[in-house]
């Protein structure tokens, strides 16, 4: 068995974006359960409806995509985006102080 060297192109990140209805009590429960399931599976909240998870390999990413698909409630929209570690490293996060300046 050969060991493949880890690099920024084999390590993956998963983003889960969602817009779930929360009008009824059942919808609120389903949305909260979806979030809890994401967190139990190792996802971290990046923004309120955006969760992110590090995956050490492409195979690991595939496993977590299947899990997310199993968590999806019957209503709403859920999107999954996978990016390499190299691509993830190019994310630009704008500090709050900069966004506040643009509002003045």
Kindly give the residue locations of the regions a language model identified.
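Basic nucleic-acid-binding interfaces
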Residues: 2-15, 20-104
């Amino acid at each position: 068995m050969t060991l493949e060297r880890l690099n920024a192109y084999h390590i993956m990140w998963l983003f889960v974006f969602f817009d779930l209805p929360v009008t009824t009590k059942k919808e609120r429960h389903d949305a909260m359960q979806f979030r809890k399931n994401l967190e139990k599976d190792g996802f971290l909240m990046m923004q309120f409806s955006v969760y992110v998870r590090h995956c050490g390999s492409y195979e690991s990413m595939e496993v977590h995509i299947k899990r997310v698909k199993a968590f999806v409630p019957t209503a709403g929209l859920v999107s999954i985006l996978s990016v390499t570690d190299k691509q993830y490293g190019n994310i630009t996060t704008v500090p709050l102080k900069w966004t506040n300046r643009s509002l003045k």
